[in-house]
Every structure is written in C-alpha cells, then in structure tokens.
Amino acid sequence: MGFVKATPEGKKYEKIANQINEYLDFIEAIGVNTSSVDYLNSVDFYTSHEALHLPFESALTRTDSISGKTFATSSHMVWIGDRTRFLDSAHVEYCSGIDNPIGIKCGPSLDPEELIKIIDKINPDNEPGKISLIFRYGKNKVRKYLPGLIDEITKNGKKVLWVSDPMHGNTIKSSSGLKTRDFSSLLNETSEAIKILKDKGCHLGGIHLEMTGQNVTECT
C-alpha cells in the first residue's frame, strides 16, 4: 500500500498508529503485559474472492477434525461468478460441499427458477447467512430484473443476503479504448437497488466494490 504513504490520509493514519504504540508502551511501563491481552494483538479481518480456479480451491480445502465441517481455507467467503452459475457446473458442485458462506453473482442472464435449484443444492437447510445474492445488472437494467428476482426468492421462502455489485454492469469503454466505470453510474444503480429492496420489504446487506488507490481505470 505504498501509494497511501504520500497522501494526507496516510500521514494522518501513521500519526494515529504511532500514538497507539506510545499508549501500549505506557501500559507495559505500568506493569500490564499486553502480549497476554488477545484484543491488543489481533484483529478480525475477513476476506472473500471468486471460487474460480477449482484446483487451487480444492488444494486449500480442509475438514475440521472437531466439527466435521469442510471449509475452503483460501477465504472466509467465496462466490460463484455469473458465467459459472449453472446447476451442473463444477463450481456449484464444489460450493455445495463446503460450509463457508457462499455468494452467487446474479446478472441479466440469470434464470430465477434455476437459481432456486442452485440455492437448494448449496443451502438445503435454508440456513440464514449462508447465501449472499450479489446482483450485477447495471443502472439501466436493475429496475427491469431485480424486482422479479426478489419476488422469486420471497415466493420460495429462501433466506438470503442481498448485495449490490454496481461495478460489472456499468463497465464502459473510454474514447481511447480503456475499460472504466462512471462513478455516478455506480451510485445510481446502488440507490435504485435500495429503493427496490425497500419496496419489496427487504434491505441491502452489502456492496461489492473494486477499489484501488493506484491509477487503474477499471476500479474506483
């Protein structure tokens, strides 16, 4: 994260971090052993990525000897991409065999009835928190597709978390041929999604963004 260091925010963060170290030094000076205090030595940090390369995921899959549950240890949560989201795909089969939370990307090509079958395969017990539906329609299509998807999920009583991915449906090419996204399009799709979900008695549970501090046109 070297690009952060030269920014005003980076300097502000460094100042705060140094102050925290000073406070910890003071605590140790008065006799408190900070190494024995768990919350001073660790942080909850969660990761997620697409379960795309199955040989990689399989090599990092483990079964817990105590609970007997099987986990993909490459990430806390993995998701199935829009192009690998079909009932008989190897990716759906893999995700049905692990106990991690699973995301499912939902684009305009989605068949809602097939999605119900996929959810049943991955989450047969309809466990809350297991499935996140990450919809990626674009600002001009979210009103067309999202209401019907919500209706299908509600009709079948599926417990899901709704997550907006305003990145992939709003990709455009600049005059120079570079792929990019207009930030206003991201805001528009997300705002529209919040309204649609609210009208259907649901709420937005998260947003999927691709971010970087570097000069990358595809991210924001």
Question: What residue ranges belong to the model's regions?
Answer:
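Extended C-terminal subregions enriched in glycine
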Residues: F135-Q214
